A protein has these predicted regions:
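C-terminal and inter-domain tail/linker signature
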Residues: 1-129
């Protein structure tokens, strides 16, 4: 599996299909998450995905852009979901929301070893209000 295929499957299985066992297989033992949520372990990374799935149901993922060079994979991802659980202190609204996020990954020997993510929190908060 190429680095781009690995990252694409990570998104599809983790966010859309909730296949958390697959996500754990994608991550190296020493995985580091540099995003603001900053998972400190592989299980914590899965716990973040589980929390997101409780906030947003019917998650649909579209990889808008994906580039890979020298073990780095850069993505622009479109998310579409229904707000079904508390998020940022805002109770579930039942609204359908869409937003884009940027995620970068370092892949070594077929495993994700590091990631950097940016989700537009202010935009998401505005969509929920």
């Amino acid at each position: 599996m190429s680095d781009k295929e690995l990252v694409t499957q990570f998104f599809m299985e983790g966010y859309q299909n909730k296949n958390y066992g697959f996500v754990l297989q994608c991550l190296s033992e020493n995985y580091i998450d540099h995003s603001p949520a900053g998972a400190r372990s592989n299980q914590e990374a899965v716990n973040i995905l589980i929390a997101v799935s409780k906030m947003f149901s019917d998650m649909q993922i579209t990889i808008a852009d994906i580039f890979s060079e020298n073990g780095m994979v850069a993505t622009r991802v479109r998310y579409k979901a229904i707000h079904t659980g508390e998020c940022m202190g805002i109770a579930a609204t039942g609204r359908s929301i869409s937003f884009e996020a940027l995620e970068n990954f370092k892949v070594v020997n077929g495993k994700i070893v590091e990631s950097w993510g940016y989700w537009p929190d202010k935009e998401i908060e505005a969509l929920l209000k």
